[in-house]
Regions:
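Structural signature of outer-membrane beta-barrel channels/translocons
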Residues: 5-7, 60, 70-74, 85, ...
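C-terminal beta-signal and adjacent terminal beta-strands/loops
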Residues: 22, 179-181, 199-258
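Short sequence motifs at beta-strands and strand-loop junctions characteristic
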Residues: 56-61, 104-108, 149-154, 188-191, ...
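Hydrophobic, lipid-facing positions within transmembrane beta-strands of outer-membrane proteins
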Residues: 1-4, 53, 63-67, 78, ...
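Outer-membrane beta-barrel proteins
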Residues: 11-13, 23-29, 34, 78, ...
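Solvent-exposed loop segments that connect transmembrane elements
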Residues: 28-55, 92-100, 138-146, 221-242
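Membrane-embedded beta-barrel scaffold of Gram-negative outer-membrane proteins
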Residues: 7, 13-15, 41-43, 49, ...
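Gram-negative outer-membrane beta-barrel transporters
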Residues: 75-88, 102-184, 253-257
Length: 258
C-alpha cells in the first residue's frame, strides 16, 4: 500500500492512494465438487473429489486506486473521492451445484463517492448527505459488460436533517438504494427507507431511541432479490428466497459510560 496527502490550504487536503491485494474465492465452494455413492446408514459416501494438491486455490490480484479531496470548515465539512479497482480474474458461480470457478476474464469496479455535512450558523439545525455511485464490469471476449447482479453492488445515497438542542439530538434520514442490472438481463429493484434516530442525555447516562423504516416501506432486500437468481429453480420456487425487509421497527437503549 502507498499513499500521499497534500495540504492545499489550512482547511483543504487532497490525497492519492494505491493498494494491491489478493482476493480468495470461497474454499468450500471452490473445492466443493464431488461424486457420492448410494446412501449407507443414512450417509452418502464420497467416491471422488477435487485433489487440493493438484488444484491450488487461485488468488485474484486486485489493484485499487483512489483520488480524493476534502474540506473542513467551521460549518461545512465535505469530501469527494474517485476510485478505480481492477482484477486479473473473475469469480463465476455455477447455479446448478453452487460451486464456483475462477476465470481469466478481467474485472473492474469504479465510481465516485462523497459526503457533505452543514451546520446552520446560530441554530441547532444541520443537514447532510452521502452517496456512492459505482459501476462493476467484466471483460468478456474483449468487451466490457455489466457484472452479474448476484455479485455486483448497487449505488446508494443518503440524505439527513438533524436538530440538536441540548440535551436532545434528533435526526431523520432517508436512504435510497438504486436499481442494478447486468448483461444477462437480470435486475435488482431499488428501494427507499426513512429512519428516525434520537437521543436524550440524562444526568446519569444517555437514552437512545429509534424508529427504523419509519414509513413502513414494503420492500425486498438486495439479498432477497439475489437469492432467487442463485437458488431457483434448482432448489425450489423463487418465493422461498424473497426475503422482505423489516417493517417499522422501534428501538430503545440506555447507556452509561463510567
Amino acid at each position: 500500500n502507498a499513499g500521499i496527502v497534500a495540504h492545499l490550504t489550512e482547511r483543504q487536503q487532497t490525497w492519492f492512494n494505491f493498494s494491491q491485494g489478493v482476493e480468495l474465492p470461497d474454499p468450500g465452494k471452490y473445492y466443493g465438487i464431488g461424486k457420492y455413492g448410494a446412501a449407507v446408514n443414512g450417509h452418502l459416501p464420497l467416491i471422488s473429489s477435487v485433489n487440493v494438491d493438484d488444484s491450488p486455490l487461485q488468488g485474484i490480484k486486485v489493484n485499487s486506486y483512489e483520488l480524493g479531496w476534502r474540506y473542513t470548515g467551521d460549518n461545512l465539512r465535505t469530501q469527494l473521492a474517485a476510485y478505480y479497482s481492477t482484477s486479473d480474474k473473475t469469480i463465476v458461480v455455477n447455479r446448478t451445484d453452487m460451486t464456483i470457478d475462477v476465470q481469466s476474464d478481467k474485472r473492474r469496479i469504479y465510481g465516485v463517492e462523497g459526503a457533505v455535512d452543514y451546520f446552520i450558523p446560530d441554530s441547532d439545525w444541520s443537514v447532510g448527505g452521502n452517496f456512492n455511485v459505482l459501476k462493476s464490469q467484466v471483460q468478456t471476449d474483449g468487451r466490457w459488460q455489466k457484472w452479474d447482479v448476484t455479485l455486483a453492488s448497487p449505488s446508494k445515497a443518503t440524505a439527513w436533517v438533524g436538530w440538536a438542542p441540548d440535551p436532545w439530538s434528533l435526526r431523520v434520514q432517508s436512504q435510497q438504494v438504486f436499481d442494478l442490472s447486468d448483461a444477462a438481463g437480470n435486475k435488482l429493484e431499488g428501494y427507499n427507507t426513512v429512519d428516525f434516530i434520537g437521543s436524550y442525555a440524562l444526568p446519569v447516562g444517555k437514552v437512545t431511541f429509534s424508529i427504523e423504516n419509519l414509513l413502513n416501506e414494503d420492500y425486498v432486500t438486495i439479498w432477497g432479490q439475489r437469492a432467487p437468481l442463485l437458488y431457483s429453480p434448482t432448489y425450489g420456487s423463487s418465493s422461498l428466497y424473497e426475503y422482505k425487509g423489516r417493517g417499522r421497527t422501534f428501538g430503545l437503549n440506555y447507556a452509561l459510560t463510567f
